[in-house]
Amino acid sequence: MPYTITYQPAEDGEYVGQAIFSIEAFSLGEGYIVEPVLTDIYAGDCAAAVLMRVLNRFGFTESHTGSVEGGFYLATIKDGTIPNIPVSPGYAPAELVDALSSWGITLEDRYSENELGEFDYCYASGWMYCLNNVFPNVGFSDSYLSDGDVVRVQFTVAYGSDIGGGYAMGGSDNTSFYPVANKDRLSTLIATLNEHGIEIPDSAMNAATAIYASQEDVNAAAAVLQQLEDEYQQNAPVRDVIAKISAIGEVSLESASAIAEARQAYDALTVEQQALVSNYDVLTAAEETLRILIEELPVSASFSAPEIIALSGQQVEIPVTVSGKFEAHTLEMHIGYDSTKLTVNEVVPGAILENTSMNVIDFTTTPGTIYVGALCADAPMTGNGIDENVLLTVKATVNPEFSGTTPVNVDVNRM
């Protein structure tokens, strides 16, 4: 069966995803200058443009030849605000020093304070980059990134042979001093966990920054980080509840829906997940504060019966609407009315008086007023458009999803 694939490229400037960037000085034993970080990429951006954003984000400046648009070569990274540019060759890995000596290269105290660039420490040094574990034979300005790409900007002291990229400088595949592990997955996990604010274990960071770590050690470190990432994703509902509770803020009557939403989300968690909600005490305190606020409210309400069809000695049901206003909070409840009681059948979502029942205690009328109440009429009555006012005194039981109920005397004006 034939398939047709239609390719529609993103427009320039359109967000296309995230790449992972790191800046490394492993050849000097100095670890990361910039740990792996997720960075946004946009259609039309070359790797040079993204690199410039990363450097600026972390307070670095740079010097380069060519331009971002073409022929870009990163010459030097300079310390703008963060004093972590390596300036001493004393921590270079011993095996690398031995390999360099076979080339007749000795690392020297030849550098500029707070910057790192080409020809520092030896004549074969400079900046290179690998993209998805391959050192391209084109410059930054000629590489265009896709979502999920891993870009590792690395300092070399041997034309790339010390970091696994000697072939990019025109050498053969066997010009590398030692086997170099693929650290793309590990770099991606470090960037992801950093984004989550999760601390990277020392063992994993050591494997990431050791220039000649074995692939087995790198894979083991990635497995540890993957477990941390899996746990983070599994606890997404916990973080959602924590965020909902934090969003409650100072409690007022307007907080009722936010508190109810946080409570509902918390109750939906497993017992194990509930134990991880670090601010649960904030929720219970908010619930108690709201309960007190509701208890203290003076409650007034009015309702109307649009039409009386028939009244006799038998109980009849007339649909009415009850609206109550508590300061800035408006509640609407649809109820069914009969000659003995008012009972809430349905509550509009978000109403404070949820699950409330209202029972007629007493009623007062003026002579000649047609009314509906707990009575047995002597004869059937009919009427349309009740114009007279009838004052009913009722008792409301307030139960806003909290423990305990509070009786409140309510004067209800019925039109």
PLM region spans:
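Acidic, low-complexity intrinsically disordered segments
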Residues: 263, 292-415
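N-terminal exported-region signature
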Residues: 138, 238-244, 258, 292
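Extracellular/surface recognition and adhesion modules
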Residues: 21, 189, 193, 204, ...
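Short, charged low-complexity linear motifs
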Residues: 110-114, 242-255
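Ubiquitin-like/PB1-type beta-grasp interaction modules and other compact soluble beta-rich domains
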Residues: 1-233
